[in-house]
């Protein structure tokens, strides 16, 4: 993981790739990116952006509960946002900065978790 993508939540280091790997195990998840967003309580908290497979109907809350049931207490996600696609660079890398900025611009800047 790139160091700038690492999430520091309550003094613990959380690697987005670990959380993305768990979410990718879900049968209805096609693509996923996890970013850290500001939290009054924890400093930062993990937030997942998920693209569902065609025809999938899993709700964000159900996916959140499923993932948090598999993750350690420190790694738990604050929220899951279902999106149509993830922004990518010309070489196919997910642009996590754009996801973070869009989330904050939408007025959801504090995911207290």
Where are these regions (language model features)?
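Acidic/polar alpha-helix N-cap and adjacent early helical turns
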Residues: 101-113
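AMP-binding/adenylate-forming catalytic core of the ANL superfamily
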Residues: 1-75, 84-87, 92-94, 98-101
């Amino acid at each position: 993981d790139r160091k700038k993508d690492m999430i520091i939540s309550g003094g613990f280091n959380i690697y987005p790739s670990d959380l993305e790997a768990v979410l990718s195990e879900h049968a209805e998840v096609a693509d996923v990116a996890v970013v850290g967003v500001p939290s009054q309580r924890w400093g930062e908290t993990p937030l997942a952006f998920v693209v569902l497979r065609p025809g999938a109907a899993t709700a964000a809350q159900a996916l959140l509960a499923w993932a948090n049931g598999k993750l350690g207490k420190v790694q738990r996600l604050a929220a899951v946002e279902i999106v149509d696609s993830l922004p990518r660079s010309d070489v196919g890398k997910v642009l996590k900065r754009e996801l973070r900025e869009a989330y904050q611009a939408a007025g959801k800047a504090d995911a207290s978790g």
